């Protein structure tokens, strides 16, 4: 039995999230259907992180166990032949039994691309979030500072969250303006359900001047979801990368898959 890891990219707007559902319109369902068509046997995948409806994947990772002997490029090309244009396997790699797509990961990174312009752009539909009013980047950065570290993030989890604990370690929040865009990067050991979108909602509320920067600290320590801002739209959210120990030599996601992914290539 061989353990195979795959790097997956997908357009989340085309699916009802990652996790398999009875109607079959999820990324997992499409991937496992394609693997079954190629391998001529059912293969069950384990994913690094389940994404919600509308959330995109740039650096998603899965693994599965198989008795089949196939070359790495064969897993890539063969599986892609049965996938829709909205999903693609980027790489395949045999892994030791100790590797686990979810439990071996020590960090996850998400990007959010926000288009700031008086008029929305149809060309960016589902690819970037949109807001029509200018945002105070310095105020958002000041507010974000209180979130760094290990905290109880109950105020930013959804009612459907199945995580055993609301305590997560947020390593980094970067906010970079670029033309008509503001780019956000969130890096943590793990994220709660809707956590990034709820953080985005609060940061945007501060950026619009609805609340002072200190308000976000009050929300964090209040641990009450009702005190936070509404959940922000999923359109501009990307699972950018999953971090693993170097011993596994997991390939890095393909840079430049979307124009704004290169914003972070220098850091």
UniProtKB/Swiss-Prot annotation:
BP term (GO), one: tRNA pseudouridine synthesis
GO molecular function, one term: RNA binding
Keywords attached to this entry: Isomerase, tRNA processing
Top EC class for this record: isomerase
InterPro entries assigned: PsdUridine_synth_cat_dom_sf (IPR020103), PsdUridine_synth_TruA (IPR001406), PsdUridine_synth_TruA_a/b_dom (IPR020097), PsdUridine_synth_TruA_C (IPR020095), TruA/RsuA/RluB/E/F_N (IPR020094)
UniProt keyword Nucleotide-binding present: no
Keyword Zinc-finger: no
SUPFAM superfamilies with a match to the protein in the record: Pseudouridine synthase
Active site: residue positions: 52 (nucleophile)
Substrates-to-products reaction catalysed: uridine(38/39/40) in tRNA = pseudouridine(38/39/40) in tRNA
Enzyme Commission code: 5.4.99.12
Binding site for substrate: 110
Entry similarity comment: Belongs to the tRNA pseudouridine synthase TruA family.
Subunit structure, interactors included: Homodimer.
Function: Formation of pseudouridine at positions 38, 39 and 40 in the anticodon stem and loop of transfer RNAs.
Name of the protein described by the UniProt record: tRNA pseudouridine synthase A
UniProt organism field: Paraburkholderia phymatum (strain DSM 17167 / CIP 108236 / LMG 21445 / STM815) (Burkholderia phymatum)
Lineage: Bacteria, Pseudomonadati, Pseudomonadota, Betaproteobacteria, Burkholderiales
